[in-house]
């Protein structure tokens, strides 16, 4: 039976480096950042939703399902990942951050190939120099271990991924795909690139 995969755009952060503005809603080339992600995921998976803890009504205008973290007291991206895994009706969930408008068009394909070839429950991207755990594919079988990990006070994605023998997948030929917009200056820098 074929592996089923859904995708979630992670937009639940506090955006401290962006003066608290909702990163996913900031405009790049006239379009909110999250919509760039949505567009690049559309041909990779059949079902996409958004994890957002603020401005949910605005995100819902995109026509996709929007949900907040179930755990209280903002606990980082793993909290959104846990909620997504617990809600999923697919075997795996593909995760991407809302502030990475150039994400790889073959992200799902390469991460899926890695988990299938290794029989691992998760895979995540690297660009040849840095790990990018927010670009990841996780089995829904990880929801109980992830809940236990968060309840024990841990928050580091890579630590959890390594504990569960996550496969780091090389995207060094697409390094630019992992550029993320952490500040308004980052967005300004890329306004005219790829236009």
UniProtKB/Swiss-Prot annotation:
Instruction: Spell out the reaction equation it catalyses.
Output: Mo-molybdopterin + GTP + H(+) = Mo-molybdopterin guanine dinucleotide + diphosphate
Read off the InterPro entries from this record. Answer: MobA-like_NTP_Trfase, Molybde_CF_guanTrfase, Nucleotide-diphossugar_trans
**Amino-acid positions noted as binding Mg(2+) in the UniProt annotation, renumbered to this chain:** 99
Q: Which GO terms describe its cellular component?
A: cytoplasm
EC identifiers of the protein? 2.7.7.77
Record's subcellular location: Cytoplasm
Which cofactor(s) does the record list?
A: Mg(2+)
Per its UniProt record, what Pfam families does this chain match? Answer: NTP_transf_3
SUPFAM superfamilies the UniProt entry points to? Nucleotide-diphospho-sugar transferases (SSF53448)
Which EC class, in a word? transferase
Q: Which Gene3D superfamilies match?
A: Spore Coat Polysaccharide Biosynthesis Protein SpsA, Chain A (3.90.550.10)
Describe its assembly.
Answer: Monomer.
Domain notes, please? The N-terminal domain determines nucleotide recognition and specific binding, while the C-terminal domain determines the specific binding to the target protein.
- Name the family the entry cites: Belongs to the MobA family.
What this chain does, per the entry, is described as: Transfers a GMP moiety from GTP to Mo-molybdopterin (Mo-MPT) cofactor (Moco or molybdenum cofactor) to form Mo-molybdopterin guanine dinucleotide (Mo-MGD) cofactor.
Return the protein name. Molybdenum cofactor guanylyltransferase
Taxonomic classification: Bacteria, Pseudomonadati, Pseudomonadota, Gammaproteobacteria, Pasteurellales
